[in-house]
């Protein structure tokens, strides 16, 4: 069974993810990124998809043109786990050149 983060673990781990925000009404985090164009956005999504498949942990996401919205939560644990933190850190590195979406 996957360990859901405690309130204290969640607080500590999320301090290292300042670009992510809590999803109202869910134990989940979200981030939106804006790229130069669709090709950049799709390339980013491809890199994340490869990592997610390696981790067997898949994001909820939505893409329109150059914008990618991502939500992370672990369904098996009904909330945030270390897997979400690991994937969020990878997403931050992979999307380092992106702008925050408004």
Swiss-Prot record:
| CDD domains in the cross-refs | PCD_DCoH_subfamily_b
A GO MF label? 4-alpha-hydroxytetrahydrobiopterin dehydratase activity
Please provide the record's keywords in A-Z order: Lyase
Coiled-coil spans in chain: none
Which Pfam family is one of this chain's hits? Pterin_4a
Its recorded reaction(s) are:
(4aS,6R)-4a-hydroxy-L-erythro-5,6,7,8-tetrahydrobiopterin = (6R)-L-erythro-6,7-dihydrobiopterin + H2O
Q: Which EC class is this protein assigned?
A: lyase
Q: Which family does it belong to?
A: Belongs to the pterin-4-alpha-carbinolamine dehydratase family.
What protein is this chain from?
Putative pterin-4-alpha-carbinolamine dehydratase
The species this protein was found in: Burkholderia lata (strain ATCC 17760 / DSM 23089 / LMG 22485 / NCIMB 9086 / R18194 / 383)
Q: What is the lineage of its organism?
A: Bacteria, Pseudomonadati, Pseudomonadota, Betaproteobacteria, Burkholderiales
């Amino acid at each position: 069974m996957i360990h859901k983060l405690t309130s204290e673990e969640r607080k500590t781990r999320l301090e290292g993810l300042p670009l992510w925000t809590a999803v109202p009404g869910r134990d989940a985090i979200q981030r939106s990124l804006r790229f130069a164009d669709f090709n950049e956005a799709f390339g980013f999504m491809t890199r994340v998809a490869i990592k997610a498949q390696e981790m067997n942990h898949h994001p909820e996401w939505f893409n329109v043109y150059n914008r990618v919205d991502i939500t992370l939560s672990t369904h098996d644990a009904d909330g945030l786990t270390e897997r979400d933190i690991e994937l969020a850190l990878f997403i931050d590195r992979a999307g380092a050149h992106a702008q925050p979406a408004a």
